[in-house]
Amino acid sequence: MGMLTEFKEFAMRGNVIDLAVGVVIGAAFGKIVTALVEKIIMPPLGLLIGKVDFSQLAWTLSPARIGPDGKEIPAVVIGYGDFINTLIQFVIVAFAIFIVVKAINRLSRKQEAAPAAPAEEVVLLREIRDSLKK
């Protein structure tokens, strides 16, 4: 078997395609969550806290200044507001994944709980056994 044929078989397996679809959907879901957090959740939360724009929260370690050569030296800041936004995004994604996994587990338990119908041979053998008992 040639390497190209083996690669084609590998790439066309269900798991690889499922993974690729999952990655694409995950990337799109990440953008949705980012927009949800930055545009819908954080503005009202910032308003409740006192008209705070979380993306602008930062600790200034060194203010911006003009250097000896006349060029501006930018401020050195720790932007913890973006970290708070990212943390909230993570919590939302983790909760969404938790809900999906919980639903999948519930469905798989229901499928396991349902007994499988006996094979036709078993049904036929039981009928023969029952008729011989009579």
Swiss-Prot record:
Signal peptide (from-to): none
GO cellular component, one term: plasma membrane
Listed name of the protein: Large-conductance mechanosensitive channel
Membrane topology qualifier: Multi-pass membrane protein
Subunit structure: Homopentamer.
Subcellular location: Cell inner membrane
Gene3D superfamilies the record matches: Large-conductance mechanosensitive channel, MscL, domain 1 (1.10.1200.120)
PROSITE patterns referenced in this protein's UniProt entry, alphabetically: MSCL
InterPro entries for the chain: Mechanosensitive_channel_CS (IPR019823), MS_channel (IPR001185), MSC/AndL (IPR037673), MscL_channel (IPR036019)
Positions of transmembrane segments: 16-36, 81-101
Family: Belongs to the MscL family.
Function: Channel that opens in response to stretch forces in the membrane lipid bilayer. May participate in the regulation of osmotic pressure changes within the cell.
Pfam families tied to this protein: MscL
Entry GO MF terms: mechanosensitive monoatomic ion channel activity
Keyword Transmembrane helix attributed: yes
Keywords associated with the record: Cell inner membrane, Cell membrane, Ion channel, Ion transport, Membrane, Transmembrane, Transmembrane helix, Transport
